[in-house]
Amino acid sequence: MNGNSKVKALPASFYDDFLSDQAKEWLFSPIRGLFPLEKTPGIISLLAGKPAPSTFPFTSLSFTAKDPTNETSETTITIPQDQLAPGLQYSDTTGLPELLGWVTGLQERVHGRKHGRNGVGEGVEGWRVSIGSGSQDLIYKAVAAMVSPGDPVLVESPVYAGVIPMFKHLHCKQIEVPTDAHGIRSESLREKLENWPQGQRRPKVLYTVPYGCNPTGMTATLERKKEVLRLARKYNFIILEDDPYYYLYYGKTVRPPSYFSLEATEPFGEEGDGSDAVGRVLRFDTFSKILSAGLRIGFATGPEALLNRIDLFTANSNLQVSSLTQLITFHLLQSWGYDNFLLHTRKVSEFYRKKRDVFEKALERWLGSGEATSEGRLAEWNAPVSGMFFWFVFKLLIDPTATEEEDSRTLIETHAFANGVLALPGTVFEPNGSKTPYVRASFSLLEERDVEEAMKRLRKTVLEVRKARKQARTKNKRLGTSMM
């Protein structure tokens, strides 16, 4: 826990100005709004049109799972009929109560935040959790709840490709904030905000992936996070902290705190004036990278007023996340407990650290300054300390003074593909479709022999393109000379 009993939440009314036009029109479900009353002792409910559980064919569920404390051991988890029942029926829009409780405890434990709803109680910080069908489901609903057509949205650049169509669908104006190996370049963000055109709508949200960013692999430093958080307070915007790779951190230094953690411990106000209001971070987690991508279980953590609007979107669209997958997830987590869950995540991060090392070793050998490269370095990169991606640029121009803009799309989709290797052109991660020479490569699935072969094929591709360009320039020079 942060131990600061003076920390308190921003009032619910603070978020009124952050709601989108459509969010203000979403209606509460007349049926689901009464679900909690069914649990009142002595109540005979004629409320919901729930199917009779006795007609369901499922009587129990068993599965085996790895034991985090013993790599050679498995544990059988059985969910008997009475405990299986909640997973076979409609459940609360916010999530299965058992899973919500477990995840809330996890957020308290990992991020040091004190849970409590509506700011009631000493030190209570006004946040809660909602379960979604993966974190992207929740991110879309959060943005839809906060951004109206034409509103500007601050997005780190390059940015996770999955949110670009989302912002375009919602007709947002994507304002790019450049990043480097240390995270969002806070000085660039400050400059944009200080020089914002008068009379134009100001941004209400900033979207960022602070650990192992997809695509760049960057992990934001503590100082950068502090600077961004100070700007959020000064210029009044909400940080959308999309953090699927938080538990995949394998750096040599201590993992920097999350924005969600930091806002409750960092001095508040531009000048550190001691203001104690929290609630400018809406955090998104997922079990996809650490338990199973197929579970489609994510969770949003943040101000209750914003979570209420996300839940309204869910209630008016898909009603809820699958009760059964939530129940399976809960029973796995309950059987492990928090300590073994965190032990499991450390093992997962170590798995990816080893994958990272294998990939970088091959990258250095075939495209860096290793024994296989007599032509000098053919690519440049920064090694990630979290996640599963490398972001690198090929050195295709023979003339170091050349300034022509490169685009990796043709290189990858035509030349590399012809040589039997694929990566992702960096252009797809540019919010407004700019060209870029960068390429994203994922190292999560490949065995070492495949990594070596992939790097050999990329090297061949780069050398072929360099040779073709050199020949073309020589030919152009000859033509130019002959015309004199």
Q: Over which residues does each language-model region extend?
A:
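Short catalytic/ligand-binding loop motif for oxyanion handling, primarily in non-cytosolic enzymes
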Residues: 52-59, 214-217, 247-250, 291-293, ...
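Conserved core of the PLP fold type I
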Residues: 70-236, 240, 246-275, 282-286, ...
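Conserved PLP-binding active-site segment of the aspartate aminotransferase-like
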Residues: 302, 388-402, 423-455
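N-terminal "arm"/small-domain region of PLP-dependent enzymes with the aminotransferase-like
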Residues: 2-105, 421
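Conserved glycine-rich beta-strand-loop-beta hairpin in the small C-terminal domain of fold type I
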Residues: 345-360, 364, 373-397
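Eukaryotic N-terminal low-complexity, Ser/Thr- and Lys/Arg-rich leader segments
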Residues: 1-33, 191-202, 265-275, 340, ...
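Conserved PLP cofactor-binding pocket of PLP-dependent enzymes
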Residues: 413-440, 470-480
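Conserved core segment of the aminotransferase class I/II
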Residues: 264-353
